[in-house]
């Protein structure tokens, strides 16, 4: 029975943990860096077995409830990747509480806004996070305080005390229903202040099924998830997570020797990394002999990185680049061999192929419109080959942002189905099209399109044309002026080691490249930039809004 007396069907991402603990009690669920060996590499001597993860998260769930953090309570979690992070997350799911996750590396003013918007009743964090909460007045609504580590002047209890208080309480699992709120996950904020995406339990369960089926993930595998929240899926899939020795907020600066050491020592069979991290491994150039499945998401993966990573993997391994967003993941996916085959088209201005839609998602392309669309009856669906906004409806499609009504109206469309039911369609905020083979192509963010007097230009149909120059690391198309009359400007970041004095020659070559394609022939302004701003989560999404402001300030 649910809290209101109605019968409910249990739906909870933690529901599979007790079964896995019975089936494979001694299998390592989480392996963390821990101390250092004589060679300076992490010892990875801090582990949790499935039995330990299940039993200890039971105790913590019971203890949290005793301290007022139970069903429906929103709890900010600011804990570094560690055994405590995973114990807490599964304990909160078991308790029916609602963890709130925000990227700690975002602008501090934006971070405060996110935490205040979430209106949490509890704040769980390491001492540094608790100190910042006190000094910066984060989350003033939080009255239940749990410190992971030593507790000082800020009150509350320690996680160790919580676990002791819940010890012996037995199995814990709230009878959450599919539509109950499971978590609030904030977006990366690459297009503004991060938004809190409301995840219901059915969204998490749906993601597990889509990931298992799309990528054939089998229990017993060993995963190296370089984005910690993704590691939460591993215990539900029966995998071992090896938490890498790196700063997850700065994947572009990860030490490839440390990553390779972990993958070799523990026989890592699965790897997830942002395009920035994949470039680190690609440039390191050491084979990855045990990896059978590599995935990369967060931004389009440059074709040269795809080719290099594929060369480091075994011949029968697969390198997938899923397409999606915090609001809906995965939407589509493409394997490296297919991506390689579309490289020529991408570098000629076709956009980036993101592959076939992951079933049972339904993806449709609609006419570009910057206004809110309340009802699906008000949209115009485009035919194959026409560029428009990408929309998706499916089991992982979230339906609202927390305390962001305007953002919800702009991103969600209500659709009445033929059977009389209603569903939510998510507007991805991306533009793209379907080709004749039913593959989805990504052309860039809707807000990043440049509206010139002769028509729109889309970033992913422009930048790859210029990125082929050997002295160019990456480019970014921005618009200067009023939409409809914007001047397209190409910002250029040179490869490391290329002198600024070489830019005049590079610019001449880029002009010739642009002139060879009708849609880029009108780009007449090229600006060298020392280093593009990128998102904090994946270090891969270019901050084009900031670049556009910068470009407008440069002398003609």
From Swiss-Prot:
Binding-site positions, ATP: 187-195, 321-326, 430, 445
GO molecular function per UniProt: ATP binding; medium-chain fatty acid-CoA ligase activity
Enzyme Commission designation: 6.1.3.1
A Pfam family assignment: AMP-binding
Main localization, broad class: cytoplasm
Cytoplasm in keyword set: yes
Domain of life according to the entry: Bacteria
Signal peptide start-end: none
Compartment(s) where it occurs, according to its Swiss-Prot or TrEMBL record: Cytoplasm
Example of a GO biological process term: fatty acid metabolic process
Its biological purpose: Involved in olefin biosynthesis. Catalyzes the conversion of 2-alkyl-3-hydroxyalkanoic acids to beta-lactones in the presence of ATP.
Subunit structure: Monomer. Forms a complex with OleB and OleD.
Family: Belongs to the ATP-dependent AMP-binding enzyme family.
The name this protein goes by in its record: Olefin beta-lactone synthetase
Source organism of the structure: Xanthomonas campestris pv. campestris (strain ATCC 33913 / DSM 3586 / NCPPB 528 / LMG 568 / P 25)
């Amino acid at each position: 029975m649910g809290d209101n007396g109605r019968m409910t069907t249990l739906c909870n991402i933690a529901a599979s943990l007790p079964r896995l603990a019975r089936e494979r009690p001694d299998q390592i669920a989480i392996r963390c860096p821990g101390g250092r060996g004589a060679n300076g590499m992490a010892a990875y001597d801090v582990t949790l077995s499935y039995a330990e993860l299940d039993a200890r998260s039971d105790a913590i769930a019971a203890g949290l409830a005793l301290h007022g953090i139970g069903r429906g309570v929103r709890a900010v979690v600011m804990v570094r990747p560690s055994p405590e992070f995973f114990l807490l997350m599964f304990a909160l799911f078991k308790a029916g509480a609602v963890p709130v996750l925000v990227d700690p590396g975002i602008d501090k003013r934006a971070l405060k806004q996110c935490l205040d918007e979430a209106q949490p009743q509890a704040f769980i964090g390491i001492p540094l996070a608790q100190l910042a909460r006190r000094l910066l007045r984060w989350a003033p609504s939080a009255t239940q305080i749990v410190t992971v580590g030593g507790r000082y002047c800020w009150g509350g209890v320690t996680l160790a005390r919580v676990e002791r208080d819940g010890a012996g309480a037995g199995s814990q699992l709230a009878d959450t229903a599919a539509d109950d709120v499971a978590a609030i996950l904030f977006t990366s904020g690459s297009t503004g202040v991060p938004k809190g995406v409301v995840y219901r339990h059915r969204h998490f369960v749906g993601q597990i099924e889509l990931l298992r089926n799309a990528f054939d993930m089998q229990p017993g595998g060993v995963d190296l998830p370089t984005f910690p929240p993704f590691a939460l899926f591993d215990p539900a899939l029966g995998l071992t997570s090896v938490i890498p020795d790196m700063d997850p907020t700065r994947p572009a600066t990860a030490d490839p020797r440390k990553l390779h050491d972990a993958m070799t020592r523990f026989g890592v069979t699965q790897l997830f990394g942002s395009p920035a991290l994949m470039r680190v491994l690609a440039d390191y150039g050491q084979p990855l002999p045990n990896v059978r499945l590599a995935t990369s998401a967060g931004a389009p993966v440059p074709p040269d990185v795809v080719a290099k990573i594929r060369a480091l993997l075994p011949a029968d391994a697969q390198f997938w680049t899923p397409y999606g967003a915090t609001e809906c993941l995965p939407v589509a996916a493409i394997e490296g061999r297919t991506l390689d085959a579309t490289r020529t088209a991408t570098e000629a201005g076709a956009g980036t192929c993101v592959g076939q839609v992951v079933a049972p998602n339904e993806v449709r392309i609609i006419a570009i419109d910057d206004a809110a669309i309340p009802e699906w009856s008000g949209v115009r669906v485009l035919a194959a080959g026409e560029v428009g906004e990408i929309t998706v409806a499916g089991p992982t499609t979230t339906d609202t942002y927390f305390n962001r009504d305007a953002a919800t109206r702009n991103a969600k469309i209500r659709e009445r189905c033929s059977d009389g039911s209603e569903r939510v369609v998510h507007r991805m905020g991306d533009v793209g099209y379907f080709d004749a083979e039913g593959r989805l192509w990504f052309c860039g963010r809707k807000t990043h399109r440049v509206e010139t007097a002769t028509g729109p230009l889309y970033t992913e149909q422009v930048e790859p044309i210029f990125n082929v120059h050997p002295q160019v690391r990456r480019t970014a198309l921005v618009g200067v002026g009023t939409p409809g009359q914007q001047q397209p400007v190409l910002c250029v970041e040179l490869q490391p080691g290329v002198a600024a004095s070489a830019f005049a020659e590079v610019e001449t070559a880029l002009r010739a490249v642009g002139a060879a394609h009708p849609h880029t022939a009108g780009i007449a302004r090229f600006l060298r930039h020392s280093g593009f701003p990128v998102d904090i989560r994946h270090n891969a999404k270019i901050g084009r809004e900031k670049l556009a402001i910068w470009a407008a300030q440069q002398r003609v």
